[in-house]
Amino acid sequence: MSADPFVIVGAGHAARRTAEALRARDADAPIVMIGAERELPYDRPALSKDALLNDDGEQRAFVRDAAWYDAQRIALRLGTRVDAIEREAQRVRLDDGTTLPYAKLVLATGSRVRTFGGPIDAGVVAHYVRTVADARALRAQLVRGRRVAVLGGGFIGLEVAAAARQLGCNVTVIDPAARLLQRALPEVVGAYAHRLHDERGVGFQMATLPRAIRAAAGGGAIVETDRGDVHADVVVVGIGVLPNVELAQAAGLDVDNGIRVDAGCRTADRAIFAAGEVTMHFNPLLGRHVRIESWQVAENQPAVAAANLLGADDAYAELPWLWSDQYDCNLQMLGLFGAGQTTVVRGDPARGPFTVFGLGGDGRIVAAAAVNLGRDIGAARRLIAAGAMPDPQQLADPTVGLKTFL
């Protein structure tokens, strides 16, 4: 066996899970994890939720402490950037000019925030929520009575809005889309989210394009939009993320809205794998390549990468699943909603709880979204796996058990 280590580029959730899985399968393999941040690996979902509310929420993002990595003999090189992959020499070049050979390489480089595209005046801070440092900086600004402008009506923007309202801030959400959660979920779910926040005092400016973030004369900021100005003490931008593919692209690997890999996390270079939300991975259940920004991918896909690094032939095959917690509301989504689907609403979409099912052209259930009905997601998973084709009227009737359709 080569004395060269397994090298993991990235030090986030997917990187940690890759290292855990490698160590579980091979007690002796040398493992090196390289990350640009100086923090220990942490899970990101808490950053836009509990980490904005209290210190305990931030601490829960750190699943493993430094002693665990030492005990597992996983070498951490934090605050270090990989500048290049030298594929022929099978080594990576670091930002200090040194190189590190690898037996196999895993790219778990994750993603970065999509930044605001308009001008921002000097001295004005536009907050993002991607790192622990981001969450700390924003939490310090969420003081009761402050005006908070949130640019973006997706999951991150709404979670930040919920946290800010819980802390007593006055919140306005601004989004160019006509409705909330427009990119991922049916209209009925976005309408429910709108009511949920509206009832708690969040203001909305939908179908509104932010153009610039200016410094206000008396302090704070002004968000200039195509429909007027929004005055704020704190501005938060939550308009999506971009996969960190530059390292892979410079190395000549296939990149297509993510690092393109097969179901086994393999790139075209059999010494290089990729895992986590940076991957455009083939999903056997969907029959196509997808890039999914979710905790589930970071949690479970790395086990497949680790197994195949060591010679297995496993495949990552899970339906996309994600969740969002806003106030006392839990929203879960399974599968992918898309054009051409028929939606069936089960329950009370005005007050909740309710579930929305997406039916494909042949009548099979292909997706589901549940508001405060997590058990329906478990049932939907079984129905999708069984290829269930329920009668839409019966499916919409909450008195008819979902088991009936199996």
UniProtKB/Swiss-Prot annotation:
Function (record text): Part of the multicomponent anthranilate dioxygenase, that converts anthranilate to catechol. Probably transfers electrons from ferredoxin (AndAb) to NADH.
Specify the taxonomic lineage.
Bacteria, Pseudomonadati, Pseudomonadota, Betaproteobacteria, Burkholderiales
The entry's keywords: Aromatic hydrocarbons catabolism, FAD, Flavoprotein, NAD, Oxidoreductase
| Protein name, UniProt field | Anthranilate 1,2-dioxygenase system ferredoxin--NAD(+) reductase component
The record lists FAD as bound by: 5-37
Which domain of life does the protein's organism represent?
A: Bacteria
EC number(s) per entry: 1.18.1.3
The record's family statement is: Belongs to the FAD-dependent oxidoreductase family.
